[in-house]
């Protein structure tokens, strides 16, 4: 039993030993595993710390590199700025050096000029001394005149140069402004224009009327031409006769006379004279109406009735083929437009423009230029001096006193210079016929003179009580000789002196 206890105790000890050993081995194995885990964890943490340290090191290197680059850029920028400042200072020093050299040069020049001035002063002092010695024997007035003459000679050249420069500048500016004003005026006024002709036609009811117009042995046509001073041309043109005359007024009166005769049907010398007087009255009325219409178109009010009538007469006057009344209206409107543009008196400019050729209404009846005659008429009918000056100055016979007078002259030139406004050849022809009549009228005892047949014949009507047959022949000869001396004309010119004595009695 004891052995069993011993064996059991030994077995228990062995089992305890085995169990303890097993537990120890388990603990050792667990400790090894824990140690391995700790080692692995430590290695892992060490790797992570290493990686983190590497990353942080790289970031630090990158940061340090960026800081270095920034610092390097800053330093480079500072160096560039320093270089620029140095360059600027160098340029400044260079300019200062150049300025200094210029100043030195100027000082040298001033020094030279000063020396020259000093020499001039010394010379002037010498001249003044000599002049004073000479002036000692002069009066105060003589000395004053001498000093003024020297001053004039000294500054005359400078004044002339300054005057020339200012004149050129003013003329240039004035030309620009004038072109602008003229263009504005021309744009505002663009009239229709129809050239004037020297013939009129009268329609007939039939060709039989031509024979009645001619009359027995041509007495009717001779009477008509003698009374009207117009050529009556009868040709093969059916149912038409032509009136030819350079004077539009005579031609218009003749046209109305002939139309009345044709309408009446009774054509003989006495009837011709009667119709001629009626036609004159109609034309007088038309002249007045034309004058009133002209003042309305031009915007001119308050003219004397006689001036209005004279304006109407301009309807039957031409200048180089241009109707004088239309020309006057055109000048008035152009002058008014330009005056408005320049801020001047447009009413005054229009008035002067409308009246500038008023003398042409009567210049065939009076001696003198149309401007002189026009000025006298304007003065007679109460126009102011500035308007009279516009009439006289538009052809340069008198200096313009107002800016409006200059505008009237400019408008006159504009109207005449318009393309197609005037015809030189027609005007020369008309002037030759007018001169022909003037030569004949210049002789004593001549009542009327008519140039007919396109200027190839002139008929002169004389006072029958004072001119006998012998004197009539002498008068025809004298007129022909004066025409030869004063006038150029093609071919042969016929001078016919008509002396007609009428005795009238009435049976009651």
From Swiss-Prot:
Residues 324-417 form the HD domain. One of its GO terms (molecular function) is RNA binding. Pfam families: HD, KH_1, RNase_Y_N. Residues 198-283 form the KH domain. Its EC number is 3.1.-.-. The chain crosses the membrane at residues 1-21. GO terms for cellular component: plasma membrane. Keywords: Cell membrane, Endonuclease, Hydrolase, Membrane, Nuclease, RNA-binding, Transmembrane, Transmembrane helix. The keyword Magnesium does not apply. SMART domains: HDc, KH. It is found in: Cell membrane. InterPro entries: HD/PDEase_dom, HD_domain, HDIG_dom, KH_dom, KH_dom_type_1, KH_dom_type_1_sf, Ribonuclease_Y, RNase_Y_N. It is a single-pass membrane protein. It is an enzyme of class 3 (hydrolase). GO terms for biological process: mRNA catabolic process. NCBIfam families: HDIG, RNase_Y. PANTHER family: RIBONUCLEASE Y. Endoribonuclease that initiates mRNA decay. Belongs to the RNase Y family. This is Ribonuclease Y.
């Amino acid at each position: 039993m004891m052995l069993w206890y011993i064996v059991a105790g030994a077995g228990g000890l062995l089992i305890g030993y085995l169990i303890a050993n097993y537990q120890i081995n388990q603990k050792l194995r667990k400790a090894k595993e824990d140690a391995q885990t700790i080692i692995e964890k430590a290695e892992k943490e060490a790797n992570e710390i290493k990686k983190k340290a590497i990353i942080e090191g790289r970031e630090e290197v990158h940061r340090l590199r960026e800081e270095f680059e920034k610092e390097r850029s800053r330093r480079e920028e500072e160096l560039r700025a320093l270089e620029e400042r140095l360059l600027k200072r160098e340029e400044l020093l260079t300019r200062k050096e150049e300025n200094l050299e210029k100043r030195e040069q100027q000082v040298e020049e001033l020094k030279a000029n000063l020396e020259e001035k000093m020499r001039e002063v010394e010379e002037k002092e010498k001249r003044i001394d000599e002049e004073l010695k000479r002036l000692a024997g002069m009066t105060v007035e003589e000395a004053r005149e001498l000093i003024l003459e020297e001053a004039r000679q000294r500054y005359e050249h400078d004044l002339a140069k300054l005057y020339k420069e200012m004149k050129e500048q003013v003329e240039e500016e004035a030309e620009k402004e004038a072109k602008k004003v003229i263009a504005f005026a021309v744009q505002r006024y663009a009239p229709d224009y129809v050239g004037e002709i020297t013939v009129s036609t009268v329609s007939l009811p039939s060709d039989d009327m031509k024979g009645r117009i001619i009359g027995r042995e041509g007495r009717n046509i001779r009477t008509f031409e003698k009374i009207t001073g117009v050529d009556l041309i009868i040709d093969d043109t059916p149912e038409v006769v032509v009136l030819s005359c350079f004077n539009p007024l005579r031609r218009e009166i003749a046209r109305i006379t002939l139309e009345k005769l044709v309408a009446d049907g009774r054509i003989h010398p006495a009837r011709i004279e009667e119709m001629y007087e009626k036609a004159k009255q109609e034309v007088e009325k038309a002249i007045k109406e034309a004058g009133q219409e002209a003042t309305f178109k031009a915007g001119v009010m308050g003219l004397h009735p006689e001036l209005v009538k004279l304006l109407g007469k301009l309807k039957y006057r031409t200048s180089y083929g241009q109707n004088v009344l239309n020309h006057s209206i055109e000048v008035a409107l152009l002058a008014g437009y330009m005056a408005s543009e320049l801020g001047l008196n447009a009413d005054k400019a229009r008035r002067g423009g409308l009246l500038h050729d008023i003398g042409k209404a009567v210049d065939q009846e009076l001696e003198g230029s149309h401007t002189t005659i026009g000025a006298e008429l304007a003065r007679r009918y109460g126009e102011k001096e500035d308007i009279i000056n516009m009439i006289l100055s538009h052809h340069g016979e008198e200096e313009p006193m107002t800016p409006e007078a200059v505008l009237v002259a400019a408008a006159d030139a504009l109207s005449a210079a318009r393309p197609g406004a005037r015809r030189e050849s027609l005007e020369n022809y008309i002037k030759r016929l007018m001169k022909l009549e003037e030569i004949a009228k210049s002789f004593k005892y001549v009542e009327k003179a008519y140039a007919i047949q396109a200027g190839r014949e002139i008929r002169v009507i004389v006072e029958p009580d004072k001119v006998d047959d012998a004197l009539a022949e002498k008068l025809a000869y004298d007129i022909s000789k004066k025409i030869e001396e004063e006038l150029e004309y093609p071919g042969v010119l016929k001078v016919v002196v008509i002396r007609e004595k009428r005795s009238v009695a009435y049976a009651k």
